[in-house]
Amino acid sequence: MLDKLDGALRFQQEALNLRAQRQEILSSNIANADTPGFQARDIDFSSQLKKVMEQGRASGTGVSLSLTSARHIPASTVQPPDLDLLFRVPDQPSMDGNTVDMDRERTNFADNSLKYQTDLTVLGGQIKGMMSVLQQG
């Protein structure tokens, strides 16, 4: 039964994970806006989500969970997928080779943040719906 619940929530979980990783990439771009030669990077969110949904996340050296009771359910550790980072082509290249366009980065950052919040709301609604079904029997 737990595998069915996991399958029902997996898409939103993976979308949230990718949005969080993209937010880190975008914040790195913003932080390095004045670094000479820094190349702005991003990911193609839809293709990365499709890749993760098809291939799954690799088992590996992610965060391990400790079991303090024999009744705890063991969990396998997973690590974030290897993202295909893309270099952004600048609209106006700077003299120092930096390709960060702050307007574009801020817009992408705000857009990604809004979509992250939306995904959280959808996931919360799914969980509330499942809880309602379970409570009603």
Swiss-Prot record:
GO terms for biological process: bacterial-type flagellum-dependent cell motility. It is found in: Bacterial flagellum basal body. InterPro entries: Flag_bb_rod_N, Flagellar_basal_body_rod_CS, FlgB. Keywords: Bacterial flagellum. Its main location: other. GO terms for cellular component: bacterial-type flagellum basal body, rod. Disulfide bonds: none annotated. It comes from the Bacteria. The basal body constitutes a major portion of the flagellar organelle and consists of a number of rings mounted on a central rod. In Gram-negative bacteria, at least four rings, L, P, S and M are present, whereas Gram-positive bacteria lack the L and P rings. The rod consists of about 26 subunits of FlgG in the distal portion, and FlgB, FlgC and FlgF build up the proximal portion of the rod with about 6 subunits each. Belongs to the flagella basal body rod proteins family. Structural component of flagellum, the bacterial motility apparatus. Part of the rod structure of flagellar basal body. This is Flagellar basal body rod protein FlgB. It comes from Yersinia enterocolitica.
